[in-house]
Amino acid sequence: MDIIRTIEEMRSWRQKAGRVALVPTMGNLHEGHLALVREAKKQAERVVVSIFVNRLQFGQGEDFDSYPRTFEADRDKLAAAGVDALFLPDERELYPRIRQDFNVEPPHIQDELCGAFRPGHFRGVATVVTKLFNIVQPDAACFGKKDFQQLHIIQAMVADLNQPVKVVPVDIGRAADGLALSSRNGYLSAGEREEAPRLFRELSRIRENLIDGENDYASLEQDARATLEQHGWRVDYVEIRQADTLELAHAGEKRLVVLAAARIGKTRLIDNVEIFR
């Protein structure tokens, strides 16, 4: 596996690589990331994984400084998974002037759901993903459905800006008890880890009610919020949206997604389930 640290080296490697699939990450890799790698290997002859903890997508008071940097373990996992190249730029390589004067500004959806609690987050995501697309020039790029809003924004960005990249969604990886795999799960104490699967259970309960024909979305959302809060969670949101557009859902719609973000202890977890009825 080649380890590439500069844009110049990445572009030189790319010229000889044939069809390439990219998996953008912030490191601290887990089985969910490796599932993205496996899908990427189906999409292209060569696979590039990027590791870059992107300051632009962290807000004030968030965990940029404490976000786990686990390079040696990540490198070993990627090599064992058969990745062809690891793109590992430092911050000055991607942001030579530190600040970024030109950004990719998503539409109003960036201010809803997670965006309402993380101002500027999706601008930072869209900007760094565009930079990675410009540098690596992948034919395909794999993104997990756990970050459903992020996936939607990237798909819309690629379509609207005619970026020549196939965006490949990959299903959420889960632990045996249903908890969505996340690098931030490592922040959980033993007791919090035991409680954490409740988020998925509440979303699954909403899904069952929707499949059974329930259309009182507000009551379903409120019941889930109340249950989580009774068990010590601080809930940012539980919302039922249109799966294809992330617009507000209306009674009787067939393609839905239930999205949630909530904190248990100091750890913010997100999850979602899709419904096709």
Swiss-Prot record:
Q: Provide the Gene Ontology terms for cellular component.
A: cytosol
**Which GO molecular function annotation, any one, does this entry have?**
ATP binding
Q: What does this protein do?
A: Catalyzes the condensation of pantoate with beta-alanine in an ATP-dependent reaction via a pantoyl-adenylate intermediate.
First-listed, main subcellular location of the protein, grouped into a coarse class: cytoplasm
Q: Which InterPro entries does UniProt cross-reference here?
A: Cyt_trans-like, Pantoate_ligase, Pantoate_ligase_C, Rossmann-like_a/b/a_fold
Known SUPFAM superfamilies for this protein?
Nucleotidylyl transferase
Q: What is its EC number?
A: 6.3.2.1
- GO BP, one annotated term: pantothenate biosynthetic process
User: Its annotated pathway?
Assistant: Cofactor biosynthesis; (R)-pantothenate biosynthesis; (R)-pantothenate from (R)-pantoate and beta-alanine: step 1/1
Compartments annotated for it: namely: Cytoplasm
Q: Where is the active site?
A: 33 (proton donor)
Q: What interactions and quaternary structure are annotated?
A: Homodimer.
- Which positions are annotated as binding ATP? 26-33, 144-147, 173, 181-184
Recorded protein name is: Pantothenate synthetase
- Enzyme class at the top of the EC tree: ligase
Q: Which residues bind beta-alanine?
A: 57
Recorded superkingdom: Bacteria
- Residues the entry annotates as binding (R)-pantoate: 57, 150
